[in-house]
Amino acid sequence: MTTPRTGKPWRHLLVWLHVVSSTAWMSGAAGLAILLGLSRSDPALAGAAVGAARHLDVFLLAVAANASASTGLVLAWTTSWGLVHHWWVAAKAAITLVQLYAGIAILSPVLDELVAGGTPAPAAQVAGAAAMASAVAFQAWLSVAKPWSRTPVARRERARGRTKLPPAGTPLVAAGVLAPVGDVALTVALGVPAPLLEVVVLGVVGVARRRALTRTAPAAAAPAAPAGAVPPAPAPRGS
């Protein structure tokens, strides 16, 4: 049986991996902005700068972003904070998803075109990379300050008698640690970002936690007896 003590090392590893990957994501985005800015300031270095930026994007920024997102979501799902029970957690998750979409659908394709043409980066590309680094820094502040109140979801659960979410078991937490490590190996082997294990683990953790929380949901409180009602007499004891 899993106890809080046996699961603690895995939870510490998950928090550590989230901090490290988030720091790498922010640093990679800042480095990307610098390289893209260099391609604009010196046309002679444009090809080399955007080439280096693409390698940074594929082998650091994308890997770190995927790991930061997956570990952050697993942390939210498997701890008492919950994913949609506190506004600061929900805000971090929303910002992360927006950044992943922007990186995958906008920034990376443009970067591939720049490498193919050896052309300087447009100003919007530099601004996008800088905005990504700033957004990760803001998320770090949210983790430290934990501003704002509980969400309506948390208030409804509190009204039903659940004041705190129970933590998940060790297997789910351990999966959240091991999946990013496995995907790093896949990325190195394939040469492209491959968050396959992280996507699978997120699906498993999300479904498992939803089922577990549904099973342990507190029963609705019984209606209060009307004023003046006589309580039932106790049943007679057997001889």
Task: Locate predicted features.
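Polytopic transmembrane helical bundles with strong interfacial aromatic enrichment
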Residues: 1-41, 48-239
